Amino acid sequence: MRVITLSGITLFLLASLASAIELTFKLENQEKQCYYLDSFHTGEKTHFTYAVQSGGSFDVDYMIKAPSQKTVALGKKRRQADVFFTLEEKGEYEFCFDNHMSTFTDKIVTMEITMENELSLPALTRDEAKDYKKDSMQSTVLEISTALSEIDRVQNYFKTREHRNYSTVKSTQARIFWFSLAESIMVVALSALQVFIVKTFFKRSGRRGV
């Protein structure tokens, strides 16, 4: 089992904090990989998503565990998953992927974890706090951030579909090639068998005539 600790780039946008981690890795046959993410705050909204890009039936098992070993989410033989949850504990969250159902096939998996946490406003008077909340620049930045996140999610979706379709096309081409080769060998073998039968028939007929 392979264990990796994740670290991401944290972006501060005015009164909100968002961090995102994206990783593409190879999950070999009969292998289990676990990734660990440190949570220093509770209440953070987290979005976990993954998709199998190529390999076999494009499916793996996954499991998310809290620091207390409580199961947050799990799935069996899933091609992809979108999980939204809130970090309720401090410590290491565990994200595991299991490919034990595949005896020979390796998988390419893309995983992304996005966390958002609203920070408390600075100590201001009531009127200043109202003006701060209504600040148009903050609203614009938050709207742009939301729109960019949605665009990124859509792009990842189409990228995953493209990888899967490409892998399916390659697999189909390989099957067509081997099927055509086997068919050609069978045609040649049947032709040779027919020639052999005809020759044998005429040889026997010639002997009887003599």
Curated annotation (Swiss-Prot):
Q: What is its main location?
A: endoplasmic reticulum
**Segments on the Lumenal face:** 21-175
Q: Does the keyword Secreted apply?
A: no
* Mode of membrane association: Single-pass type I membrane protein
Set out the biological process GO terms recorded for this chain's protein: endoplasmic reticulum to Golgi vesicle-mediated transport; Golgi organization; intracellular protein transport; protein retention in ER lumen
Q: Which residues cross the membrane?
A: 176-196
| Subcellular location field | Endoplasmic reticulum membrane
The positions making up the signal sequence are: 1-20
CC annotations in GO = COPII-coated ER to Golgi transport vesicle; endoplasmic reticulum; endoplasmic reticulum membrane; endoplasmic reticulum-Golgi intermediate compartment; Golgi apparatus
Keywords assigned: Endoplasmic reticulum, Glycoprotein, Membrane, Signal, Transmembrane, Transmembrane helix
Protein name as annotated: Uncharacterized membrane protein C17A5.08
Q: Which residues lie on this side of the membrane: Cytoplasmic?
A: 197-210
The answer, when asked if Cytoplasm is one of the entry's keywords, is no
PANTHER family under this entry? Answer: TRANSMEMBRANE EMP24 DOMAIN-CONTAINING PROTEIN
What species is this protein from?
Schizosaccharomyces pombe (strain 972 / ATCC 24843)
**GOLD domain: from which residue to which, for each copy?**
32-115
Q: Which residues are glycosylated?
A: 165
Name the protein family. Belongs to the EMP24/GP25L family.
